[in-house]
Amino acid sequence: MTNDGLLAQMAAYEQCVLDRDRQLAESVLHPDYALVTTNPALMVTPRTSWLALLPDYIVHSWAVEEHLLDVRGGTAVAFQRIDMKATVLGTDRSGLFLISDVWLLEDDWRVWRRHSTAITAAALPAQ
């Protein structure tokens, strides 16, 4: 069994962030998706709030420095270190990030959780 479907969905998820493409995002996100950030404090952003934020999440550059993918049955975990330059709600959100995505295979692969830890970036602005 290959991971082609998973890899295609992972590429689509990255593309929806870069292009701020809500329609593509809705096809990739699990219905129970949430973004979990940890710096400076734990914050959970549910799917509807993340989709609402997407137009104001402007990525100027995105470089994957490290990538590791583990797959077991219908669960996959992707770990990445990302160097990103971005503006979120008008605030600079550039820096290094450690990102772990949990993917679930149901009708298709969907990202269920993204855990993002900013190593060098400023805190997310208040929403």
Predicted features along the sequence, with ranges:
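A beta-strand edge to alpha-helix "cap/lid" segment located at domain peripheries
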Residues: 1-27, 34-127
